[in-house]
């Protein structure tokens, strides 16, 4: 009888930077929040410049958060935004109307 086994792998890239925090969306409140993994130290990171945020990705090495705004599903007013990890220096990557109800994001690292 043969045995079937598995070898665990490290899903994180070696030496990849980390903020050590969870970042998540409050869709109904239109906010981006952050907390420690145990739920403590809850902070509002973004509370403006969003309309139904729906996708979120971090680039910790560059110090950025990227997110999508769905906008009104009946209108062509979706957008993609970026800010620093602390919510400062918010800019528009794709302006409202540049995409229709964008959803998830993926950041491709070099």
Which stretches of residues belong to each language-model region?
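Hydrophobic core register within WD40 beta-propeller blades
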Residues: 4, 56-58, 103-107
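A short loop-to-beta-strand structural motif that recurs across blades of beta-propeller domains
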Residues: 31-33, 78-81
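Conserved positions at the start
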Residues: 19, 53, 101-104
């Amino acid at each position: 009888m043969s045995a079937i086994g598995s070898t665990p792998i490290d899903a994180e890239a070696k030496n990849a930077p980390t903020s050590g925090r969870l970042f998540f969306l409050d869709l109904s409140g239109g906010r981006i929040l952050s907390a420690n993994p145990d739920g403590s130290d809850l902070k509002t990171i973004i509370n403006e410049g969003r309309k139904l945020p729906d996708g979120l990705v971090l680039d910790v090495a560059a110090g950025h958060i990227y997110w999508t705004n769905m906008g009104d599903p009946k209108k062509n007013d979706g957008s993609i935004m970026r800010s620093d990890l602390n919510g400062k220096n918010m800019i528009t990557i794709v302006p409202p109307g540049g995409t229709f109800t964008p959803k998830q994001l993926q950041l491709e690292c070099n």
